[in-house]
From Swiss-Prot:
Sections of the chain in a coiled coil: none
Gene3D superfamilies: P-loop containing nucleotide triphosphate hydrolases (3.40.50.300)
Signal sequence annotation: none
Pfam families per the UniProt record, alphabetical: RecA, RecA_C
Protein name: Protein RecA
Location of this chain's protein in the cell: Cytoplasm
Function recorded in the entry: Can catalyze the hydrolysis of ATP in the presence of single-stranded DNA, the ATP-dependent uptake of single-stranded DNA by duplex DNA, and the ATP-dependent hybridization of homologous single-stranded DNAs. It interacts with LexA causing its activation and leading to its autocatalytic cleavage.
Protein source organism: Pseudomonas putida (strain GB-1)
Annotated ATP binding sites: 65-72
Biological process annotations from GO: DNA recombination; DNA repair; SOS response
GO MF entry, a single one: single-stranded DNA binding
Domain of life: Bacteria
Matches recorded under SUPFAM superfamilies: P-loop containing nucleoside triphosphate hydrolases, RecA protein, C-terminal domain
Amino acid sequence: MDDNKKRALAAALGQIERQFGKGAVMRMGDQERQGIPAISTGSLGLDIALGIGGLPKGRIVEIYGPESSGKTTLTLSVIAEAQKNGATCAFVDAEHALDPEYAGKLGVNVDDLLVSQPDTGEQALEITDMLVRSNAVDVIIVDSVAALVPKAEIEGEMGDMHVGLQARLMSQALRKITGNIKNANCLVIFINQIRMKIGVMFGSPETTTGGNALKFYASVRLDIRRTGAVKEGDEVVGSETRVKIVKNKVSPPFRQAEFQILYGKGIYRNGEIIDLGVSQGLVEKSGAWYAYQGNKIGQGKANAAKYLAENPAIGAEIEKQIREKLLKAGAAAEAGKAAAVDASADDVADAEAGY
């Protein structure tokens, strides 16, 4: 950059700082880059697939899927994990369907959970914005976008047409909320439902409710599906679940994680620790027996997981090693890609300069 441009840029930056305050514009290299803080989902496999160890704070996340696929269970699991670290959490129950007893079984401290059951979509989103602006709430769940009914629709007649009202409401609210979420470093999760588009010949006919605004504003979008049943004998005790990361602004997208959700218990975390421990060579498997550091911990996966439940310190130790191994490997791969891109950019610059 020549001297005239440098002086013009310095003058512009000085004027911006005087008018809007210090830090309104900054060079990326002036500050040391920091990792994005994350809140665990309760699923070890999903945390690793997300690339940063969980869902990013200060961002909007959308979780969508068919009915009974585990959307609310996953969000309650996020709340339980956040509360373990002293976080304040809120649940905006637009569907009026939150079961405190079930939430308690998943590990949620129901007594400390803030709950709102708003009458209209406007009220729900205004409450969400006020909680964010308080800078005192760490996690907010909105369940669900489909239940955010505009006031005009509630007060109107049953057969009245209200085209695009909900989409406009979501677009306006997200424009207003996004900046506040970043400043408050608050994680806001919107649960969404699936609808079918009529007349689609090619591609997926599935879409989510509430227009396109949430698709753009969300930093992470998770597609959760039930893929099968977990049985003990003939009794169904849970469901096999697959989560696909269809959008991720903080790490590479399109990864997926599979785990089990047990009815009345939540995500089968110890089962995930066993599976990932075996795949990473931290847990030895010989026939039906599982061993850790030479000590047998159980015959069969169920017994090994039961051992970890009875000895949480060992489970936490294995989980810590898995996280360090897989998350560091992912970070190293990303750093390698970034270095390669920087090197190629330098080569192009040198070529243009005639070196």
